[in-house]
């Protein structure tokens, strides 16, 4: 494909998917855009970089409520390309109504027109209906980028060794087994494992079995400590009861940082479960992003110093054409959690995005919070899925899979 004409749409996936599938030499966006053209150019450039595309991207403005102007714009692009011996294809999947009508008027004049059949992951050539199937593997960062956001940190890269992964999965099981005692235990670990500075955490710990700090009491949990040693997360555990002290060593810095983070184990449960499911092509946790795109005049460092909206999502998955945003809670979800997740879903995926709250607490199907989540299109995975080992099944169903 030489030249692809895209009718610019509010839904970002419509603007960029055909470029990923067909990798044309040139892409021309036609129509009015809803944001400054500099931002469109910046996110398009980032999109191309993320996906290794060498296509040349251009923008051709046309008046949104003027059929003649839309028709003239599309016609001039087609004539220019044909005069240079280049084939032209118009993607009519997105775009405003008049732009679509204008593009449709070129059916039958030798210009190819394509349309996305998203239910079957294929493009249809009009009017004959020839189908081109594709297997979309879109990264989580690409979804955020094309919607006008910038990922600036993925908290955990999950570059774990085989040994580390086995240990982490054992600790995840302990997290659920000792759920009622875990929070208090982690508070104790946090106090005895304080960093000397922001870069360094000592792996060797020597601490009292219990103590008070600022009126708060902290106490070790022997059962959990012994289980962590069996799992390999800590080593050389020595509990000296007559001296009311203990000492041990963390397996390494990664495990030390994980063990003092209470909420990370639910995120990691979601991560490893999704990672083992072939339907998800990209899986990330601790994804931080801002609602803007840096450019030459305003680099990322400046964006981060300004009051630009930003979020951290506990888990972001990619399934075909759909981004999946998951908020993990070790408490019952609140309305504020639903509002925040819904705003992210609408901004960075719209009709294509899925949103889920995963909680270790029970959520009654007749409760106001469940009913509101349903009204907002947000799925809920509660403690029953974890207790019955049905997390993978629930993730599949809530992100587009069929009930078994």
PLM regions and their residue ranges:
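Long, low-complexity, Lys/Arg-enriched
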Residues: 1-87, 101-310, 322, 346-404
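Short glycine-/small-residue-rich Rossmann-like dinucleotide-binding loops
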Residues: 9, 94, 330
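Short glycine-centered, acidic/aromatic-flanked micro-motifs in structured strand/loop junctions
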Residues: 31, 92, 328
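Short N-terminal targeting/anchoring amphipathic segment
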Residues: 86-94
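Conserved catalytic cores of phosphodiester-cleaving nucleases, focusing on short active-site segments
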Residues: 274, 315-317, 324-332, 341
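Charged helix-capping and loop-helix junction motifs
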Residues: 311, 339-340
